[in-house]
Amino acid sequence: MIDFDPSYNFSQDRTFAFISEHPLIKEAGAEVGNPLIEGRLVQITENILAARGFTRVSKPEEADLAVGFTLGEREKIQVDSYPEFYRGGYGGWGWGGGYHGGYGGQSVDVRQYTEGVLSVDIYDPQERRPVWHGRATGRITKKMQENPEQVLEQVLGNIFATFPPSN
C-alpha cells in the first residue's frame, strides 16, 4: 500500500537522511529477532534512493526528506473449513444388499503463521509532517528467514517502486 500527500512537490527534493541514528521503530510488543535488520534496511534504502538521484546527508534537519521504518510481526491463525460428503449407494454381497444412506460433515484446517509488516515513512523535516507512506505485509516463512537480505531487497524494491510519485 502506498499513500502520499498530493499537495507535496517531490520534484524539488534531492537529499535525504534517516530520522535518527536508529531509524527502525518496532511495533509495541513486536520482537525483531535479528539485530542486523536495521542496518540492512538503511543500506538497501540508501542504494534504492541513490539510484534515483537522491544524496544522503547526515542530519535530518539538513535534508529535503527524512526516512523512518516501522517493523512488526503478528502471530495469525487461518481457519478453513471444507464440506465432506460420504455418499450412499447400492451394494452388498448376496442376500443382504441394498441402499446405504450418506451423510454430510465438515473438515476444518487450522494453521498458525507469522505475518510481517514493514512500513516506510518519509517526512518533510522542515515542516515536520509526513509526506509519503509505503507498507508491505506478508507471511514470514522459514525460507525467508534464511536469506533476509534478499527478502528485504525485494520488499523495499516493491515499496519504493513508484517513489517519488509524480504529481
Describe the predicted segments one by one.
Residues 65, 69-129:
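Surface-exposed short loop/turn segments
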Residues 10-14, 56-63, 122-129:
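A short, structured loop/turn motif at beta-sheet edges
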Residues 25-26, 41-45, 91-95, 144-148, ...:
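Glycine-rich loops and low-complexity Gly/Arg-rich segments
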Residues 2-24:
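Post-signal peptide N-terminal segment of mature Sec-exported envelope proteins
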Residues 1-7, 107-167:
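C-terminal/domain-edge helix-coil "capping" segments
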Residues 19-76:
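N-terminal segment of the mature soluble domain
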Residues 35-40, 85-92, 139-142, 152-155:
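Short, low-complexity, polar/charged sequence segments that are solvent-exposed and flexible
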